[in-house]
Amino acid sequence: MSDKKAQHGVSLKKEWLACRFQEGLVFKKLDANGKVFIEYLPAENAWVPVDAPNYTFINCFWVSGSYKGQGYGAHLLQECIRDSEGKAGIVAVSSHKKRPYLSEKSYYVKHGFEVCDTAPPYFELLVKRFDPDAPLPRFKESAKQQTVADGNGLVVLYTDQCPFTDHYTGDELDAIEQAYGIPVKRVKLTTKEQAQNAPSAFTTYSAFYNGRFVTHEILTKAKFDKLWNTLGESQG
């Protein structure tokens, strides 16, 4: 990855992946200089608050730039389907509309997925079922809380699943704290158990303001500037 801001985060992500390989995670990437890859693992070991026994969970699925529309995504998804033979099905987290860091719902639907549960404010759990008699996957209740106990200022929950979170939970949050004079707290989820009981459906990065969820998008000072007025309106 060429982005210098992510260099340390890439090392952390590799360490995170190495530990997950022991828990059944599969990482497959197109042999090209681009972000074309898929990660999946047994849902029981996913770092997400879902209840999906005997399902495969797609942890990250990314086809970027000029590689879109060439069938690479379909090939990678087919690899996941093939590796999931004998399972109850495959699950993934998406949204009712296109959002950063979430694979598009329309793509999953085109490949036989359907919505089986939702979590506020906009998350959807999608499933491709192989066993019609298996229980449908569900978000855990914690994913639907969308609140944290620390109700003062900005709280960011994050993991090393994304190579960008390390940088953007550092200097960028410092800049927000200094500019707005609000408390900023970082909470790094370091175990599967913490992630599986998180108060958000997206454990890679979730931001809470005055105790309530505001976004899963990685915040910069510029992004927070745009959020500031809406935060006052929604929580006033």
Stretch-by-stretch model annotation:
Residues 94, 109-126, 214:
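Conserved catalytic-core motifs of GNAT/GCN5-like acyltransferases
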Residues 59-68, 96:
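A short, internal acetyl-CoA/4′-phosphopantetheine-binding micro-motif in the GNAT/acyltransferase core
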Residues 63, 69-82:
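Conserved acetyl-CoA-binding loop-helix of GNAT-fold acetyltransferases
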Residues 2-32, 45, 193-194:
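Active-site rim helix/loop that mediates acceptor-substrate recognition in acyltransferases
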Residues 29, 33-45, 57, 62:
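Conserved beta-strand in the GNAT
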Residues 143-179:
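Local sequence-structure signature of Cys/Sec-based thiol-disulfide redox active-site neighborhoods
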